[in-house]
């Protein structure tokens, strides 16, 4: 559970290091192992790290790939990063770390926004593309990893929690509709709303592209299918398939870690 934050300014001002520090202070509990900060004029990223894959400093963030002109902050885990890395190596990419973070950078450089179709995992990340001068942001299909943001004519700011955004100058008034949802829907406020008017959530399965003028392009790259299975199978076959899927899901998560694994059993499964 890492913490990410960032600012992309459109008003001609540079990102303030102190302002970024204020945001990172509200993310510290999410990443106790190390912290990192990167500022380049009007764009700046902050990261609080909880080390899971590649525990060395080479896996630290924000991760900068100077050769590709890309900088990334990322929260999450890419379960199939090893197979993606092998594919990218076969395509000529050279890696300097063993992290899934770097796999995202190379995948984005190789396939652009289509890289999202290849990522199997839980994630929220932001990539600054120096060549195109654009910011690319994406959230995983089910919205497991959080991504909160505020968009104005002056700047686009984002973080893994709303507390980090509340350190900034934005509308902090209560959204009454979202508050009612918070209290009546078991604490769930459907994206993009939050109980704070000046803070939004990026929808699951969605990406955003921003340019230096503050223009925002938002697109849904995945949504669940509402179609019923065409096959006519028995209840026992459904049980067996569910067991197979759960086994496969647990297995791939166990393979994506360089630290000891713990298991929490609820009463549900």
Region roles according to the model:
Residues 1-269:
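Cysteine-centered catalytic environments shared across enzyme families
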């Amino acid at each position: 559970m890492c913490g990410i934050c960032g600012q992309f300014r459109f008003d001609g001002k540079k990102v303030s290091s102190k302002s970024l520090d204020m945001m990172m202070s509200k993310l510290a509990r999410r990443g106790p192992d190390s912290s990192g900060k990167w500022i380049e004029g009007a764009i700046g990223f902050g990261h609080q790290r909880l080390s899971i894959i590649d525990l060395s400093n080479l896996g630290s963030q924000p991760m900068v790939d100077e050769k590709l002109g890309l900088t990334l902050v990322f929260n999450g885990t890419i379960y199939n990063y090893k197979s993606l890395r092998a594919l990218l190596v076969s395509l000529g990419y050279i890696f300097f770390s063993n992290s899934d973070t770097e796999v995202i950078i190379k995948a984005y450089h190789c396939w652009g926004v289509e890289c999202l179709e290849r990522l199997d995992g839980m994630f929220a990340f932001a990539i600054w593309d120096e060549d195109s001068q654009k910011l690319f942001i994406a959230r995983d299909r089910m919205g497991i990893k959080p991504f909160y943001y505020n968009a104005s004519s002056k700047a686009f700011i984002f973080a893994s929690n709303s507390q980090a955004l509340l350190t900034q100058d934005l509308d902090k008034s209560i959204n009454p509709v979202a508050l009612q949802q918070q209290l009546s829907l078991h604490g769930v406020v459907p994206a993009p709303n939050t109980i704070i008017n000046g803070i939004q959530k990026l929808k699951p399965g969605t990406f955003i592209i921003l340019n230096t003028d503050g223009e925002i392009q938002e697109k849904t790259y995945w949504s669940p299918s509402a179609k019923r299975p065409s096959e006519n199978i028995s209840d026992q076959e459904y049980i067996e398939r569910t067991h197979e899927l759960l086994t496969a899901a647990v297995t791939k998560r166990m393979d994506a870690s360089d630290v000891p694994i713990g298991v929490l059993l609820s009463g549900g499964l």
